[in-house]
């Protein structure tokens, strides 16, 4: 996170909270803690100057902040002198501080008046504000958000002047060029915009993770470059979970778009400050605060491409003094660092965010490693033990009637013992009879097996809350493996709202595990979504929080039809296999037949076997007879043909004889006639 701007942060980390030094004089140091409060400290005497708590500091926590530039402050101060009601005549009247929130609104806070100056909401962002940049010449400021848009605001009218889409994903960082005509924006890729036309001038490769800081390192381009005010300038970029800070140069469109050089540090950079180079011979001084609490100092002349990453010239650490041999020095995290006006000293902010220590340290160019011993035992630093001791258990009278269960996360109310009469004192009276041990044991009612202790109605809710806050696997298993639906509903109804999202995340993680546990988690998920639907609908980042769960449910629903078909087929196959196995094992009951057919005896069968041999001979004889019959038939046919021929000849003879008779001729002799007869 660069000074004067805001970036993404992790509230649980020792560093990474939105903070910034006031411009030019660095008289104030502003930081927004994770509890939503804004604190302004005086750097000269390390005294708390102001403290401001926004009305919606719990739901809309501060995500980034930026001081108004000194030039704009002087202009605002001159305008305010005209008012009689605010005749202060000081330049600090317009020390405005812009605060970006998690719900998309921007607050303008006046450190002089100690109250809210104005609020920018209408027509702006719909999601978390990641970075704010003031324009150095006019009354505009620019903001970017997770909703992918960049918004140009007017601080006088508190309205949107222009709004355009900056990237396909969330835009995490902004930076205005020294001449005020260009704007750098970054998500994962870096874009250079022309503010007048809102068009992209150049594209840069960027980082693999979201960019958290952008800073121009030079004011004027080199003399060899075209004098368009932007070509040839260098700027610096740092990203989340990236130990390299890349340096880019604005070149012509046809040239390479990768980084010209890079600086390497020991951990992720959380705060970056630098001194601008006014000419090509002046080196750039860079101070990088890492998440591990160290400060790395670099000094390099930007002149073209450099292949190897550059290491720091000096490293600064702070530790507690080791008093004696038994006491080990402990490191003190450095939270922020900024160069002073002389560029030879450094303002360090270290300790904790509730009571930071601000110190000015002189730089020595000869030392490569500086370790400062500081005692911060006098500074108030809340610990876990002090937080636990502040939780007090309410004491209730035995006659009081409790209408609602106790607050989840606290112990059950402790009832006062019944008031004892004054006679039951420890003092013994002379002459009084003392009860025996047997009588005392009988009065103590040691038989507790028949009795049942009064169960706390909120015990499961308390266990679930403690398990989610401490991430205790055993406690979560004990609670989430409950199969009683009524108990699940009562538990979900009593949990506090702050653990609803962690509970949904835990259920989503368990839904991806074993199928047996997933069936139980569905009951919990159904109760949570049903009971706390109104609360979930008010969350601004609900889509990101429940995106994994939604995709998981969609994938399960898409495969449900196929799984049901497969389930039906498998049931059919298994049923048939089991039925066939059962039928084999079962014995059929004995039944009497209505009709019995008895075949011939075996003796008759043996007699019948002998003719079977003769049947072959008979078969041959039959074949011979058939062949003879066929021959006889052929002979008969031949005889019939001969008879027919004889008949035809006789008819012809008769015709001849009849003709002769008609003619009177007769060739027949008596002898021949007798022969014929």
From Swiss-Prot:
Cellular localization per UniProt: Nucleus, Nucleolus; Nucleus, Nucleolus fibrillar center; Nucleus, Nucleoplasm
Q: GO CC annotations?
A: chromatin; fibrillar center; nucleolus; nucleoplasm; small-subunit processome
GO biological process, any: regulation of stem cell population maintenance
Tissue specificity annotation = Detected at low levels at least in heart, liver, lung, spleen, thymus and hippocampus.
Q: Where are the WD repeats?
A: 13-51, 57-119, 124-163, 166-205, 207-258, 266-308
Membrane-crossing ranges are none
The job of this chain, per UniProt, is described as: Ribosome biogenesis factor that coordinates hyperactive transcription and ribogenesis. Part of the small subunit (SSU) processome, first precursor of the small eukaryotic ribosomal subunit. During the assembly of the SSU processome in the nucleolus, many ribosome biogenesis factors, an RNA chaperone and ribosomal proteins associate with the nascent pre-rRNA and work in concert to generate RNA folding, modifications, rearrangements and cleavage as well as targeted degradation of pre-ribosomal RNA by the RNA exosome. Involved in nucleolar processing of pre-18S ribosomal RNA.
Specify the protein name: WD repeat-containing protein 43
């Amino acid at each position: 996170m660069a000074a004067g701007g805001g970036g993404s942060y992790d509230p649980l980390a020792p560093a990474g909270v939105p903070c910034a030094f006031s411009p030019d004089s660095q008289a104030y140091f502003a930081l927004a803690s994770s509890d939503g409060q804004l604190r302004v400290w005086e750097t000269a005497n390390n005294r708390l100057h102001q403290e401001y708590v926004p009305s919606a500091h719990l739901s809309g926590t501060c995500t980034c902040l930026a001081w108004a530039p000194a030039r704009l402050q002087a202009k605002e101060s001159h305008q305010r002198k005209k008012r009689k009601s605010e005749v202060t005549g000081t330049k600090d009247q317009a020390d405005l501080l812009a605060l970006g929130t998690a719900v998309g609104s921007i607050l303008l806070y006046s450190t002089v008046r100690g109250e809210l100056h104005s609020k920018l909401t209408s027509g702006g962002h719909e999601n978390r504000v990641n970075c704010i940049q003031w324009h150095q010449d006019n009354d505009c400021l620019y903001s970017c958000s997770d909703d992918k848009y960049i918004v140009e605001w007017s601080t006088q009218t508190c309205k949107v002047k222009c709004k355009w889409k900056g990237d396909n994903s969330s835009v995490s960082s902004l930076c205005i060029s020294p001449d005020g005509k260009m704007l750098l924006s970054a998500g994962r890729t870096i874009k250079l915009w022309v503010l007048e036309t809102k068009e992209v001038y150049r594209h840069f490769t960027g980082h693999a993770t979201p960019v958290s800081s952008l800073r121009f390192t030079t004011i004027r381009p080199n003399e060899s470059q075209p004098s368009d005010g932007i070509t040839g300038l260098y700027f610096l970029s740092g990203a989340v979970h990236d130990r390299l800070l890349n340096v880019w140069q604005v070149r012509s469109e046809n040239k390479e778009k990768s980084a010209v050089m890079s600086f390497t540090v020991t951990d992720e950079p959380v705060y970056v400050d630098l001194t601008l180079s006014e000419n090509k011979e002046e080196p750039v001084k860079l101070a990088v605060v890492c998440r591990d609490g160290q400060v790395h100092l670099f000094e390099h002349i930007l002149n073209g491409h450099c292949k190897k990453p550059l290491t720091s010239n000096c490293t600064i650490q702070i530790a507690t003094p080791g008093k004696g041999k038994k006491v080990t020095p402990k490191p003190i995290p450095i939270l922020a660092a900024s160069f002073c006006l002389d560029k030879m000293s450094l303002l360090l902010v270290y300790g904790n965010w509730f009571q930071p220590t601000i110190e000015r340290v002189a730089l020595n160019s000869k030392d490569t490693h500086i370790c400062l011993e500081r005692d911060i035992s006098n500074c108030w630093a809340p610990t876990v033990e002090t937080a636990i001791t502040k939780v007090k258990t309410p004491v209730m009278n035995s006659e009081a009637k409790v209408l609602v269960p106790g607050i989840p996360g606290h112990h059950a109310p402790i009832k006062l013992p019944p008031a004892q009469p004054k006679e039951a004192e420890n003092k013994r009276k002379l002459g009084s009879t003392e009860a025996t041990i047997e009588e005392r044991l009988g009065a103590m009612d040691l038989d507790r097996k028949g009795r049942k202790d009064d169960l706390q109605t909120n015990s499961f809710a308390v266990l679930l809350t403690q398990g989610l806050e401490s991430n205790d696997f055993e406690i979560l298993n004990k609670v989430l493996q409950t199969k009683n639906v009524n108990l699940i509903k009562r538990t979900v109804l009593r949990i506090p709202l702050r653990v609803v999202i962690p509970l949904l995340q835990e259920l989503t993680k368990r839904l991806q595990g074993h199928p047996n546990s997933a069936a139980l988690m569905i009951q919990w998920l159904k109760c949570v979504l049903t009971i706390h639907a109104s609360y979930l609908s008010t969350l601004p980042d609900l889509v990101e929080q429940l995106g994994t769960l939604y995709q998981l449910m969609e994938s399960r629903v898409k495969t449900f039809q196929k799984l049901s078909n497969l389930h039906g087929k498998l049931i059919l196959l298994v049923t048939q296999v089991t039925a066939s196995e059962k039928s084999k094992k079962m014995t059929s009951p004995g039944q009497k037949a209505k009709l019995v057919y008895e075949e011939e005896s075996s003796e008759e069968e043996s007699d019948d076997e002998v003719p079977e041999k003769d049947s072959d001979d008979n078969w041959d004889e039959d074949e011979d007879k058939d062949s003879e019959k066929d021959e006889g038939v052929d002979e008969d046919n031949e005889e019939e043909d001969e008879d027919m021929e004889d008949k035809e000849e006789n008819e012809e003879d008769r015709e001849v004889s009849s003709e002769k008779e008609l003619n009177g001729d007769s060739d027949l002799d008596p002898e021949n006639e007798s022969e014929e007869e």
